[in-house]
């Protein structure tokens, strides 16, 4: 069982001004995390300002480098013993972060999966299914999302 104070939350964000402040505020209200890092991946809106106003530490990319680069920037900067990566658009309920944290320390990797219902396009769904299958094969465990 990991304590939330040992967890850095890494949140890549690109033009998420409409949601990032609320997501950060809900995370902060739910637990005393080590830190919440929002990686502003070249946004042209108020993403960084709203994340900072809600209490996050913001790492800025001067231009869009992509989600993978944003996640890497956040993980490299994270000071917590554990790192939880979460989207800034609110598709994952922030309160679910604590449900994942209770498994940290028991396992080397904890993966949270979204519900089967999704708004993704058919092409994106097929791509996700392929990557999920590969991840499941490589880990020897079912990874549904």
Q: For each of these PLM feature ranges, what is it?
A:
Residues 6-8, 35:
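Cell-envelope/extracellular polymer assembly enzymes that use nucleotide-activated donors
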Residues 40-48, 90:
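A conserved acidic beta->alpha catalytic loop
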Residues 16-19, 43, 93:
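Donor nucleotide-sugar binding loop of glycosyltransferases
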Residues 15-29:
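Short, well-formed alpha-helical segments that are part of the catalytic scaffolds
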Residues 63-77, 82, 91-145:
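Acceptor/aglycone-binding surface of glycosyltransferases and processive sugar-polymer synthases
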Residues 33-37, 48-77:
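Conserved donor nucleotide-binding strand/loop of the catalytic core
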Residues 9, 13, 39-41, 61:
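Conserved sequence signature across two-component system core domains
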């Amino acid at each position: 069982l990991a304590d939330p104070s040992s967890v850095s939350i890494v949140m890549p964000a690109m033009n998420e001004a409409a949601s990032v402040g609320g997501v950060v505020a809900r995370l902060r209200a739910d637990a005393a995390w080590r830190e919440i890092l929002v990686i502003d991946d070249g946004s042209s809106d108020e993403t960084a300002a709203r994340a900072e106003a809600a209490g996050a530490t913001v790492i800025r990319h001067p231009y869009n480098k992509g989600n993978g680069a944003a996640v890497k920037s956040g993980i490299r900067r994270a000071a917590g013993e554990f790192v939880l990566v979460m989207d800034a658009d609110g598709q994952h309920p922030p309160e679910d972060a604590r449900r994942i944290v209770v498994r940290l320390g028991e396992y080397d990797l904890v993966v949270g999966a979204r519900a089967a219902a999704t708004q993704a396009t058919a092409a994106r769904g097929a791509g996700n299914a392929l990557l999920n299958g590969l991840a499941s094969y490589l880990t020897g465990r079912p990874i549904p999302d």
